[in-house]
Amino acid sequence: MLRDTLKKAEKARDKKALYGEDIDLERFIKEEAGEHEEVPRAREVPKKVQETLLKVGVDPEERERAGTFIQVDQSGICTTCASESIEIMGMNVALDRYSWLKDYMWKAVAVDTDKYTATTALREAEGEMGGYFIRSMPGSREVFPLQACMFIGDENVMQTAHNIIIAEENSELHIITGCATGQDVSSALHVGVSEFYLKKGAKITFTMVHNWAEQVEVRPRTGIMVGDDATYISNYILTSPVKSIQSYPTAYCTGENSRVVFQSILGGQKDSVLDMGSRVILEGRGSSAEMVSRAVSKDASQIYSRGHLAGRVPEVKGHLECHGLVLSDDSMIYAVPELEGSATELEMSHEAAVGKIAEEEVMYLTSRGLTEDEAASMIVRGFLSMDITGLPPELAAETKRMLDMSLKGM
């Protein structure tokens, strides 16, 4: 790692994040996270891990999958690849194989963003490199998705991962990633740094399902660099309880006619604190962005739904939409849409609405034989089941199945 990068990380070791609750990292740092045995196929991971994988859309049988990466705590335990048009491997392997890869590290996400990015870099320098490297070859169009899972199996572990995803020119890549904890884990911290690089004409769809334990803290840090005529589509689903999560991925549309879509489905339960959002910087002529979120708060949960669209050059378009349902007097949704225009001839809009379930809808469903609880549950599931755009038909159907499974507890 470059000396300048390490110096920046050292200075930011205690730097608080701009948003979200501050976390004492010393609570989670264990001298040695348990080592986990590598296996050649996903179906050979421990049964307790397999059961959780299915809940987050990761198939242990690897049916219709182009490849698989599974990390348990800090150990990459399974890597497979069934396609010649893509590469997938642990970051430690990739850095040994490709000397040029270091030039991509900490370019889309600044190492001194906060204590979480800094700690990830410092652990990397000490040899604790987690995360995966994915690359699609120029001109390739992989039909089947890659799947990746970050799994926490030990108590009080701080899991760090640094992922780099590169879509070469005119390539298309689909990724399903699931993050989860074991049934015996009550307290842990996950920090995932992800850097995406989309070259000219490339497309990435990235579908993520989170299924954490109630006392787990989560701090993803994501940056996306989008080149000329490239498209990045993110689908995010979280409907299970978690202690707190704070995520604010930022996409930089530097290329002409580049396009970004963020679609998020959030279900706050128990005393979860969800501080979620996305930011798109439109810097290339003809670039565009769409950010859509659906949020439901129950029990004593708190949801902060943020969105920031910045138009920096003429001829860009963007729309930001946040809709929320508050289902209990002890819960809260705080919508924060921001539009920033610093050029002429741009077109940006936002729509935000927070409310409750309409009584007439409940009355109609109860008149058809449902109880009030059944009626409310049906309305919530319908509200959260928004159409996922931009996916191939087979992957869209699978994503809908993953969403339906996630919504069973709502």
From Swiss-Prot:
It comes from the Archaea. SUPFAM superfamilies: Stabilizer of iron transporter SufD. InterPro entries: Fe-S_cluster_assembly_SufBD (IPR055346), SUF_FeS_clus_asmbl_SufBD_core (IPR000825), SUF_FeS_clus_asmbl_SufBD_sf (IPR037284). One of its GO terms (biological process) is iron-sulfur cluster assembly. Belongs to the iron-sulfur cluster assembly SufBD family. This is Iron-sulfur cluster assembly SufBD family protein MTH1150 homolog.
